[in-house]
Amino acid sequence: LLHIPSLPRRFTVVGAGVIGVEYASMFAALGIEVTVVDKRDRPLEFLDRELVDELLHQMRNAGVTFRLGETVERLEVVEKPSRHVVVSLESGKRLVSDLVLFSAGRIGATDHLNLSATGLKTDDRGRLAVDHEYRTSVPHIFAAGDVIGFPSLATTSAEQGRLAACAAFGIDT
């Protein structure tokens, strides 16, 4: 996405989380027709509803279309007459786009950590449960970042790691 040769006329973003909304805003500011698709009825659920409502209002005014409560069924690249992507939704709607960004979430990368040897269990998305100090159910094991889930952002993960390390070594934060 950072190395596209030219700007698209139509841009579809699958996923209305932080990354999806950020890129949708940037491309809309460039005058590009943007559609955001998300299976949830409300994007950015962790933010105050009034803030999200205002953000959506501003984004709609900038030309962004939201297809909330929709699930992508299929993506099809069509080569002729010009290369584009057809995004088919489970509702039967079809979106035609020049560029698609898939930013519909992360899963914890825990498959190869041999967690069974530790007694730790993950949820259905591979995430570990932690307390306020990032301590797992095994008292001497801490976890941070994508393996604990929300929000899966690099800066947040770095801060979680710092706090977990401080807790592990008994350092006040």
Language model features: what each stretch is:
Residues P5-K39, L44-L47:
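Rossmann-like NAD(P)H-binding beta-loop-alpha module
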Residues L1-P8, R94-D172:
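FAD-site-proximal beta/loop scaffold in flavoenzymes
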Residues L30-H132:
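A Rossmann-like FAD-binding core segment of flavoenzymes
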Residues G17-G20, D48, V52, A154-S157:
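Short, conserved glycine- and acidic-residue-centered signature motifs
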